Amino acid sequence: MRLCRCRDAQNPLFLRAMDLYRQSFPEHEQRLWPDQLSAMEDEAYHALLARREGELAGLAFCWDFDAYLYVEHLCVVPRLRGQGIGQRILALLACAGKPVVLEIDPPEEEISIRRRHFYERCGYVANSFAHVHPPYRPGFTGHRLVVMSSPRVLSQEERERFARDLRLRVMRYASPPAAEKPESGLKKGC
């Protein structure tokens, strides 16, 4: 399996990845198409496509910040789930050599409990601080999520940095923008 960065929004594989994204996440957790295109212009944003035998196997939309990698969206093609693809994507992301941060729904029903166990098996730990992800789209409110990180829980300073980066950089690409314009110039991606 290969994980490659896609910068071309017209690439047929990326268009299939966007279909997977729309099928895998509820509407309130998705960017609008123009916002997705804008995010792809940001050097810190990586639309990573997992390919197996030339076909789309999954995706990881992530942000490569100086001190950590933030996995904003991760999903696997439904017919390929349970075959270790998600684990391999996470293992490849770990090659960045810095902490990896992601968010999950609170483990309150079977699917979210299974999702938390999956990430724990992959070496992630739940952080105990309260976290509300801002809305991506008009008409929605922020939603409560659990922050997980690998290889350890985040320090107070790291939590504050994540909250700031989420508000000022990641959510810049939301409609309406949830943040002010950040400075540019982060280092190259994974």
Where are these regions (language model features)?
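A short helix-loop-beta-strand connector motif used in the catalytic cores of GNAT acetyltransferases and
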Residues: 39-49, 141
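Conserved catalytic-core motifs of GNAT/GCN5-like acyltransferases
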Residues: 103, 116, 120-140
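Short strand-loop junctions, especially beta-strand C-caps/beta-turns
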Residues: 74, 79, 103-107
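Conserved GNAT acetyl-CoA-binding A-motif
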Residues: 96-111
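Short amphipathic alpha-helix that is part of the acyltransferase structural core
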Residues: 1-31, 35, 49, 145, ...
